[in-house]
Amino acid sequence: MAGVDFRQFRYFIAVAEELHFGRAAERLHIAQSGLSQQILKLERSVDAQLLRRDRRGVQLTEAGRLFLEQARQAVELADRAMASPRLAQRGKRGLLRVGTTILSIPPIAGRVVQAFEERYPDVEIELHPRIITELIDGISSFALDVAIVVAPYKSVDPPPRYQQLGTYELVVAIPEGHRLAKLERVPRSELLKETFIEGPRSINPEMFDHLHRILFGEIEPPSRLEVADVEEARRLQHVAEGKGIGLAGTPPGVEHQALPGVVFRPLDEDTPPIGYGVVWSATQTSPFLDSFIEIAREVAVSEGTLQPA
């Protein structure tokens, strides 16, 4: 191979993860034709077919699967090398790239980051707030070292490792003065009689489907209001305006933070909690990863959301 083009590596990783040139091109913000040309150039450079294209779509060849793992690690090392002079100028000896979900940020996230910074002041924390699908892609492609997420999340191959730190309990968000606000607990059957406010399924399809199964079983809510807002606080503002009811998560035994115009009520039946924790790649090479995970466990144990090992 005459030279290494890490841009082509990134292009290949995107196609390998999406298994679809159109979605990969959209993710990379480039034209699909240009992406196809770059992948062909890469295959000529390595003298191997990495992708199998047919009417059914795109599949990785055996050579492609082997190359994907190496390409991810190469891109990660290149990114670290490019960052090292900048870090050295600031007196830092390393960088840890931490992803956080913008959909529903676990309350523990900020405290874990703060505890790590206090113990390792010479390591720079780089925060990347993203939607959950982008976080898992970032872990798989080594663009992120670790992420604090709400589960469940999309499955990838190989699957990331996961350490649960705590759980959320689901509560119903109701406009103040609404008939359901008079109840101590809300029957699930009542949810089907109201307009249900939620974000787009594309943000986290696995979580979206999981919550629908919990709340509605196999029945689709007859009236939905899909809003573009991915942050819980913004979605709850639609509830406060009386447009419908919604869903929120709160740590067990903790009342949800008050919001003008909104009241929170538990469901009348026990519902499975929603877990949150840290995810990382089994082949991640960051020298600070293990320390971050250990600190995350310590913080969770100290706050009572995780039982000591």
Predicted regions located by residue number:
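N-terminal short secondary-structure element
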Residues: 1-38, 54, 67
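Beta-alpha-beta core module
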Residues: 156-163, 168, 233-283
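Central regulatory/effector-binding core of bacterial HTH transcription factors
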Residues: 93-155
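Secondary-structure junction motif
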Residues: 107, 184-188, 194-219, 250, ...
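Flexible hinge/capping segments at coil-to-helix
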Residues: 161-170, 174-196, 281, 290
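A short LG(V/I)-centered, amphipathic sequence patch enriched
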Residues: 43-60, 65
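Hydrophobic hinge/microswitch elements
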Residues: 131-144, 150, 200-263
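A late-sequence structural motif
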Residues: 108, 262-306
